[in-house]
Amino acid sequence: MDCCASRGCSVPTGPATTICSSDKSCRCGVCLPSTCPHTVWLLEPTCCDNCPPPCHIPQPCVPTCFLLNSCQPTPGLETLNLTTFTQPCCEPCLPRGC
């Protein structure tokens, strides 16, 4: 299956909810500290459906699709200093001034 296909996110089963930007279809989500034990600098792309992620995105870049846990609060997210970049799924993430 071509994971770079232009499709909207599928919502995974379980207590997680996939939230996408309204202006773009996105295939992968990112686990934020509220759902994963990783620090904000170690976020990894996680595919929304059953195929490998299309690319390995280095941080601090994050895709426009976030995987958030709807059953738990998100403490401290307002204090995180994140810079996001909108980009096609399959192009390498090249942040400027991060």
Curated annotation (Swiss-Prot):
Belongs to the KRTAP type 3 family. InterPro entries: Keratin_matx. The gene is KRTAP3-3. It comes from the Eukaryota. GO terms for molecular function: structural molecule activity. Coiled coil: none annotated. This is Keratin-associated protein 3-3. Interacts with hair keratins. Localized to the upper cortex of the hair shaft. The keyword Repeat applies. Residues 3-59 are annotated as: 3 X 5 AA repeats of C-C-X(3). Keywords: Keratin, Repeat. In the hair cortex, hair keratin intermediate filaments are embedded in an interfilamentous matrix, consisting of hair keratin-associated proteins (KRTAP), which are essential for the formation of a rigid and resistant hair shaft through their extensive disulfide bond cross-linking with abundant cysteine residues of hair keratins. The matrix proteins include the high-sulfur and high-glycine-tyrosine keratins. The keyword Ribonucleoprotein does not apply. It holds the Pfam family Keratin_matx. One of its GO terms (cellular component) is cytosol. Sequence repeats lie at residues 3-7, 47-51, 89-93.
